[in-house]
């Protein structure tokens, strides 16, 4: 890049402005990256808790449904499930975390009371109720896990994108700009030294000519004086 820049003071000022702007942008992106990482770590902690809950709730739901089938039979369990009239409803909204839009999943009608499940209290046992409770809680955990996992992925993508931009400024653009700045400054200094050397050379030559022709200089001065007196 440095060899492609014309070494002028105008270009030097333009590059210095670009360096200042790039350094400010680099600092801003670094702060954003660090903030995103902190937010990501919070979400990661939450995700680990949710995964643990998901495993526990899944095992409990499987254990309870197996117990209900063993005690009541598949027909009774399927009949209780088929009696369900109100199915869970899920709505999605969004929230902003440091410029990253992540989903916020809201669920309703997941947890139900005994009379909301549709099957009669007579003819069913507590085993079926326990299985229903376990699966309702499992579904709520799955919904929360989907929200957290999606947010974590979006945050991670934004962190990687921000890191690439920081690295591009730090390891490519800014070094190229500093190299161009040094190149122009060096060339301008060379031009200044050459100009000083040229002026000194002209001055020395003039002084040398004056020393070689002192009589001519005296005669010229005398002629000038006579001319002035005659006027």
UniProtKB/Swiss-Prot annotation:
The keyword Iron does not apply. Gene3D superfamilies: 1.10.287.3240. InterPro entries: V_ATPase_D. Its main location: membrane. One of its GO terms (cellular component) is plasma membrane. HAMAP family: ATP_synth_D_arch (MF_00271). PANTHER family: V-TYPE ATP SYNTHASE SUBUNIT D (PTHR11671). Component of the A-type ATP synthase that produces ATP from ADP in the presence of a proton gradient across the membrane. This is A-type ATP synthase subunit D. It comes from Natronomonas pharaonis (strain ATCC 35678 / DSM 2160 / CIP 103997 / JCM 8858 / NBRC 14720 / NCIMB 2260 / Gabara) (Halobacterium pharaonis). The gene is atpD.
């Amino acid at each position: 890049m440095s060899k492609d820049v014309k070494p002028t003071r105008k270009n030097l000022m333009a590059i210095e402005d670009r360096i200042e702007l790039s350094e400010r942008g680099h600092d801003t992106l670094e702060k954003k990256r660090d903030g995103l990482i902190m937010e990501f770590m919070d979400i990661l902690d939450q995700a680990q808790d949710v995964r643990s809950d998901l495993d526990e709730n899944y095992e409990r739901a499987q254990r309870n449904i197996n117990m209900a089938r063993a005690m009541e039979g598949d027909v009774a369990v399927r009949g209780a499930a088929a009696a369900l009239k109100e199915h869970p409803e899920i709505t999605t909204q969004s929230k902003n975390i440091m410029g990253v839009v992540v989903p916020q999943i809201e669920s309703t009608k997941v947890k139900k009371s005994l009379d909301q499940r549709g099957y009669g209290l007579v003819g069913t046992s507590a085993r079926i109720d326990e299985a229903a409770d376990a699966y309702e809680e499992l579904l709520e955990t799955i919904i929360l896990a989907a929200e957290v996992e999606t947010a974590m992925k979006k945050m991670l993508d934004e962190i990687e994108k921000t890191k690439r931009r920081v690295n591009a400024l730090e390891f490519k653009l800014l070094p190229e700009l500093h190299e161009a700045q040094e190149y122009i400054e060096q060339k301008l200094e060379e031009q200044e030294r050459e100009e000083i050397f040229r002026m000194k050379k002209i001055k020395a030559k003039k002084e040398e000519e004056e020393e070689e022709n002192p009589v001519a200089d005296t005669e010229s001065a005398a002629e000038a004086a006579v001319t002035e007196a005659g006027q």
